[in-house]
């Protein structure tokens, strides 16, 4: 793809735990890399970092060093090996070492990530829930992506995320429904959230698609490998690829055509 002047920040969040948000973040990072994007996945779940576990890595780089200013971003990231490689920046898995950072430090991290012009996209894997730092990351990104499930409890939590995002002056997030039995169930779920948001927020999240229930997903988690690498033909991988292409097409610069009369 044509290179952007600055990376596009995509914050991936959920109103609650258990939605499969981190697996979606890891899978989208690889799927977008397959689309030709230079991707950095930043584990912004500062209280319970676990992207490293999903990827089977010994280290996810040195996020603490970047936050403290002791490490340059370029020296602190780790490249995920294999086809469709991307970089990752995380704290040690499950350490909770960065759980107490404030919004000022979160802002400095966003500024650092936005200045990383060697990437086309930075994905922020947010913590579950709607605490102040999580919502700061979500509102600071160019776009947020909300992951919800058909679980009725997920609707209230997803609405809380959307409401707080709008309260911070950001537009409503994109939406995907994970662990759906079928497309009809996913659309009912997204429709219910859309109805609530329209009634109280006067706008509706843009639905990007659903990720079906798929036994390959849990197997990829167990084997600590990205789903698109391990099971490229799985139904969930196909769905992730559709979402990735929709996201990619939203930021890919339009090609410049040269005609006899000049640039158009």
Predicted regions and their residues:
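Walker A/P-loop phosphate-binding motif and the immediately C-terminal alpha-helix
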Residues: 3-45
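Acidic-aromatic/histidine active-site loop/patch
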Residues: 1-9, 249-264
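Gly/Ala-rich phosphate-binding loop of Rossmann-like dinucleotide-binding domains
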Residues: 33, 138, 166
């Amino acid at each position: 793809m044509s290179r952007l002047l600055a990376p596009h920040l995509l914050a991936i969040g959920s109103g609650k735990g258990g939605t499969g948000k981190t697996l979606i973040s890891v899978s989208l990072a690889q799927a977008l890399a397959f689309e030709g994007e230079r991707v950095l996945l930043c584990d912004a779940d500062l209280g319970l970092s676990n992207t490293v576990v999903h990827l089977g890595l010994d280290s996810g780089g040195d996020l603490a060093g970047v936050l403290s200013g002791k490490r340059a971003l370029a020296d602190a990231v780790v490249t995920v090996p294999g086809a469709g490689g991307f970089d990752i920046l995380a704290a040690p898995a499950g350490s909770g070492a960065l759980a107490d950072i404030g919004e000022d430090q979160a802002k400095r991290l966003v500024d650092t990530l936005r200045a990383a012009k060697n990437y086309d996209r930075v994905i922020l894997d947010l913590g579950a829930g709607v605490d102040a730092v999580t919502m700061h990351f979500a509102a600071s990104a160019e776009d947020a992506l909300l992951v919800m499930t058909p679980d009725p409890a997920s609707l209230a939590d997803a609405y809380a995320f959307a409401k707080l995002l709008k309260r911070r002056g950001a537009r409503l997030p994109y939406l995907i429904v994970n662990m759906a039995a079928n497309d009809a169930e996913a659309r009912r779920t997204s429709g219910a959230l859309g109805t609530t948001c329209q009634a109280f927020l006067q706008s509706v999240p843009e639905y990007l698609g659903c990720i079906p229930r798929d036994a390959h997903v849990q197997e990829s988690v167990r084997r600590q490998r990205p789903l698109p690498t391990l099971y490229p033909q799985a139904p969930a991988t196909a769905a992730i690829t559709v979402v990735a292409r929709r996201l990619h097409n939203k930021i890919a610069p339009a090609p410049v055509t040269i005609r006899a009369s000049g640039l158009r």
